[in-house]
Amino acid sequence: ARLFKQFSRAVGDRNAEKMEKALQEILVGGSYLNLVDENSYILVVMTLLRGLISDYDVRTEVEQGNGRTDLFLRPLSSNKVPMILEFKKVDSEKDLVPATEEAIRQIRDKRYALGMPSDTVLIGMAFWGKVPKVLIGNANR
């Protein structure tokens, strides 16, 4: 439970390093054979967030702009901002950073934040096996 709380706190604080650290510790506990595609990682993160963040409605595959977000955190109160998460699975460690950049670019190019506040948080996550990488941006670039 400690790691789950650390992860959800890191998401709320928009702290990419702490998100990566908690996620890696969580992923180390399972077999990489279970992490077969992007959906595997989406399910892990959704489960972590859904059970721990009471200020948000956590949804997958929400139609936004010109596509569907991998994960969307809709705030339940006006003092919170929406968060859009896009996931990428890569085949090598060197592809982690470019994949997080591509995830943020996809959110912008497909206009997933259309009609949302300019401070909407964009989170690009890439995974190489049990190694996560996180990049955080916002809708107003």
Q: Can you describe what each PLM-predicted range is?
A:
Residues 1-105, 109-113, 126, 132-141:
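Extended alpha-helical interface modules used as scaffolds for assembling large macromolecular complexes
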